[in-house]
């Protein structure tokens, strides 16, 4: 069990580092954020299975729902930006 926790923590930190180092494409940044959300979901499921409290049972489903909504919004933003600018390079975006 400790190896699984350490693997999830390490994967989460690697994803944060990849997100901070990634400065080129919007799609890659959104994939890093989605990976972080899936890791948090896995952690919630693992830690809630150890504690049998009823009040924390719906939390993984709520997190998964919010993550799916965020992914849908991110994908629609990528489509809109690609249609207007022709690519998804972050350096070409001037959001102001």
UniProtKB/Swiss-Prot annotation:
Chain segments annotated as transmembrane: 1-21, 27-47, 61-81
GO BP of this protein: ATP synthesis coupled electron transport
Pfam families according to UniProt: Oxidored_q2
GO molecular function, one term: NADH dehydrogenase (ubiquinone) activity
One CC-aspect GO term: mitochondrial membrane
InterPro entries cross-referenced by the UniProt entry: NADH_UbQ_OxRdtase_chain4L/K (IPR001133), NUOK/Mnh_C1-like (IPR039428)
Catalytic activity: a ubiquinone + NADH + 5 H(+)(in) = a ubiquinol + NAD(+) + 4 H(+)(out)
Membrane topology (UniProt): Multi-pass membrane protein
Domain of life: Eukaryota
Listed name of the protein: NADH-ubiquinone oxidoreductase chain 4L
Provenance organism: Lycodon semicarinatus (Ryukyu odd-tooth snake)
Highest classification ranks of the organism: Eukaryota, Metazoa, Chordata, Craniata, Vertebrata
